Curated annotation (Swiss-Prot):
Keyword Hydrolase in annotation: yes
Tissue specificity annotation: Kidney.
GO MF annotation terms: amidase activity; fatty acid amide hydrolase activity
The name this protein goes by in its record: Vitamin D3 hydroxylase-associated protein
PROSITE patterns assigned to the protein according to its UniProt record, in alphabetical order: AMIDASES
Protein role: May have a vitamin D3 hydroxylase regulatory function.
Signal peptide bounds: none
Biological process terms in GO annotation: fatty acid catabolic process
Domain of life: Eukaryota
A Pfam family hit: Amidase
One Gene Ontology cellular component annotation held by this UniProt entry: mitochondrion
InterPro entries: Amidase_CS, Amidase_dom, AS_sf, Endocannabinoid_amidase
Compartmental location: Mitochondrion inner membrane
Amino acid sequence: MTLERLWQVLDPLWADPRVLSALFCGSAMAVVLLKRLGHRRIQQKMEEARRARDLALERMEKAARRFKQENPGTQTAHILSLTMVELAEKLKEGSLSPESVLYSYMGKALEVNREVNCVIDFIHGCEDQLQKVKQQKEKGLLYGIPVSIKDHIDCKGHVSSAGLVKFLGQVKEEDSVIVQVLKSQGAIPFVKTNIPQTMINYDCSNLIFGQTLNPLNHQKTPGGSSGGEGALIAGGGSLLGIGSDVAGSIRLPSSFCGLCGLKPTGFRISKLGVISPITGMNSVIGMLGPIARDVDSLALCMKALLCEEMFRLDPTVPPIPFDEEVYTSSKPLRIGYYEEDGYFQPSPSMKRAVQQTRKLLQEAGHTIVPFAPPKIDYVVDELFTRGIFSDGAAHLVDSFKGDIVDPNLKSQFNTYKLPALVKRILAIILKPIYPRIARDLSALCGVGSAKNLWDQHTAVGLPH
């Protein structure tokens, strides 16, 4: 009866074009207003995050200034000039104090940040960690070494944002495993660094904390997605940083900023306590790893990380310690190399670096063998790109819900969110003219079924 009465009231109204027009206009206005309100809430959250960062950096600056005033004789320039290995030795022997090193790097990090906008948070617990380190019975391999941490790696009492609004306000209750291990080895995590929104980008910008610049050339990007790490370390504000890498996110910032970086073998380091906008990816394995100024620093970091504490905290990590004998061995090796892979065009500087490295290795007694990577188009398009976007980029697109897309990501995001059918049609149209773009579009459609996903896992894991 109620429905019948409602229909009796509404029935004559549907026939009136003025009513229909008013309903349509009202609905459209409601949609616009809701969208504006949503954007306003997003902007408010971002402003709150920026205020929190500014307050944290003010606290950091006060701490660094206070130490400098109380210890005017601190040899800051000397401390900042030392390599990580040299600094570790001086800290262990006691000729330098952990306080002098930490506050020297805090001051330098602030200076670098003012130039290139690379630091997004001060890990205030570093001062407590400083006291704990001094009380450790055995000095760890990273005793007193300040370490910078990429944004999305959890630190107790801090937010891991991934450059996305949806993660703001989620203060972590405990450290990630890698941060716990660093602390157990005497390291002092002291700042978190900037990243691009979602981290699937080779620049370093997000709408929350802004654009990070390359300290070597402010007109250039530091690379991504561990761009904040690259910028801070290259600017001298950190000795050692922990980044992450799926498709070059450690290696590219290292290259762009003149540093050394390592993406370890998959599952070599625990990823417990690390957030990501893409989950469930098994064909292409992302990994945490170090960025530093030289190879010896990377080796020291890996030696410290691959310890019993890591294996205890995360039993899924293979309990294989760093092999010092292999690392220090002078036994001649047989090493393959190539200057071009047939897919990516190398710059002249890249070719020159390969040639110089080849020459040095030959002079050291190693056998250097040229080779061409096999099936490069198939590997890049079908295994790598389709492996990252097996779901047709659905997880990545979903991560932007309730957020605003960074202008630097607009074209990338618009491609991801195209329906699979549209991507396939565009791939067919573009194939005769731009075959590589066509293959990329096809790969972005994903694998399509569980069977295809399993087939792809097999193709990645087994040579054929």
